[in-house]
């Protein structure tokens, strides 16, 4: 899973025993060489799906990390593009990754639960960040996103179908979450990262409570499971006009 240029086991251990913010500051220089980075195939599929409803004017990448979502927003947005993250280390890598982006791109250090914007965006995207939020934090998070979107704006993010109980992936994720719960019960500060806590039914309900109109769009690039359900969907939450 990790190449020779990725983090060592010791580096991952130090990260896991840190806070979320400090952990990602430490991991940032090697983050793009880990399996934690959202694959390009997912980014391209989301961009292709959103192109059918665009173009947009101003876009925000929520919890942008090292800037993987930047290419999606620059393809879709005619105006400004902003990345927001609370890790200074991740933002530093993002700035270095796109040095020629110019004034059209801005990077802002802030907590997604207290965004420093007014209704300034037509599109908000996020990739692979929701495991860092506990279920009880979703109402506040989605209310924040609703507040920074202009009327008619969209909040979009991909969701992969969970693995079946009979597959190794199911037990791997179950084991990871169990280890993290034990770690957080015994060690401070906590490191919030749970793969199985972000459940689509709960997410849709909380988005609607925050005032969004929610649609689920299959991402056909990833095919369907044996029961006919999509392997991947894009959640599109629209702020009413």
Features from the language model and the residues they span:
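Core SAM-dependent methyltransferase catalytic element
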Residues: 223-241
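Acceptor-substrate binding/catalytic loop of class I
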Residues: 186-200
């Amino acid at each position: 899973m990790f190449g020779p240029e990725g983090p060592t086991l010791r580096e991952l251990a130090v990260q896991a025993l840190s806070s979320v913010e400090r952990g990602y500051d430490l991991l940032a220089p090697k983050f793009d060489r880990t399996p934690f980075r959202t694959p390009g195939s997912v980014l391209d599929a989301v961009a292709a799906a959103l192109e059918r409803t665009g173009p947009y004017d101003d876009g925000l990448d929520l919890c942008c990390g090292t800037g993987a979502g930047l290419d999606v927003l620059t393809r879709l947005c005619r105006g400004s593009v902003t990345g927001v993250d609370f890790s200074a280390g991740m933002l530093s890598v993002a700035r270095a990754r796109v040095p020629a982006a110019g004034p059209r791109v801005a990077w802002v250090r802030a907590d997604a639960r207290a965004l420093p914007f007014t209704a300034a965006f037509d599109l908000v995207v996020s990739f692979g960040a929701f495991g860092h939020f506990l279920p009880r934090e979703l109402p506040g998070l989605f209310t924040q996103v609703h507040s920074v979107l202009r009327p008619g704006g969209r909040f979009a993010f991909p969701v992969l179908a969970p693995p079946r109980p009979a597959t190794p992936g199911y037990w791997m994720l179950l084991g990871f979450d169990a280890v993290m719960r034990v770690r957080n019960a015994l060690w401070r500060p906590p490191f919030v990262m749970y793969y199985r806590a972000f459940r689509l039914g709960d997410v849709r309900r909380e988005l609607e409570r925050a005032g969004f109109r929610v649609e689920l769009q299959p991402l056909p690039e990833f095919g369907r499971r044996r029961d006919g359900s999509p392997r991947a969907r894009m959640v599109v939450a629209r702020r009413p006009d």
